């Protein structure tokens, strides 16, 4: 996929002497798909990486939906025609993006949208070390993807209701399994999101899968 600006050249900015500003939108948009996996040691790098993850996930899922439309296949049959394999956590925002597209764009009620989503997504975990699992600062995530944040909170609310029934009175289990990390600055735990939103989770080896 390639990212392009909706407006490649700003004539107004150019005419008032803002030559850099006249192409700023074009350069900023093209950067999303030009170089993958930027150094995320800076705020700008983190922001670009999250934009990239969402861009490629959204473009791919929308293309899958378009393919169903072209063949006049009901969106409810999405899992019968497409399976989304999350190879590690980088594309995990697919869980929230597919829900957004189904609920907001296709006007499907939540429970059916969740059934379609979980039947369509599988996740391969690459590490069990908590410090190595991808997390996004909640404020950054909310700023760039406000609707996805709302959807993730609703997914988490419903998931934790199930956890409470299974582990009544165990607040530590709720904290451990929550998609939203509460320690320090709040974060979105992408491995948790991928696990909750998948019909199958595996590791990269048999022992790894058993440990998961």
Mark where each language-model region is.
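A conserved ligand/cofactor-binding region detector
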Residues: 1-212
């Amino acid at each position: 996929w390639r990212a392009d600006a909706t407006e490649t050249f700003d004539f107004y900015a150019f005419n008032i002497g803002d030559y850099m500003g006249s192409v700023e939108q074009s350069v900023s948009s093209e950067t999303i798909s030009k170089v993958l996996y930027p150094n995320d040691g800076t705020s700008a790098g983190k922001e670009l990486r999250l934009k990239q993850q969402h861009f490629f996930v959204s473009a791919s899922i929308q293309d899958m939906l378009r393919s169903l439309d072209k063949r006049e296949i009901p969106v409810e049959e999405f899992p019968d025609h497409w399976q989304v394999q999350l190879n590690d956590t980088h594309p995990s925002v697919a869980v929230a993006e597919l829900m957004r597209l189904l609920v907001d764009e296709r006007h499907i009620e939540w429970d059916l949208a969740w059934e379609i989503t979980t039947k369509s997504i599988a996740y391969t975990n690459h590490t069990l070390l908590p410090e190595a699992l991808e997390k996004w600062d909640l404020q950054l995530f909310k700023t760039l993807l406000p609707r996805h944040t709302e959807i993730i909170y609703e997914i988490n609310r419903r998931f934790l209701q199930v956890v409470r029934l299974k582990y009544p009175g165990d607040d530590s289990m709720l904290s451990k399994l929550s998609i939203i990390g509460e320690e320090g600055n709040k974060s979105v735990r992408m491995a948790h999101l991928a696990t909750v939103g998948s019909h199958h989770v595996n590791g990269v080896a048999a022992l790894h899968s058993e440990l998961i």
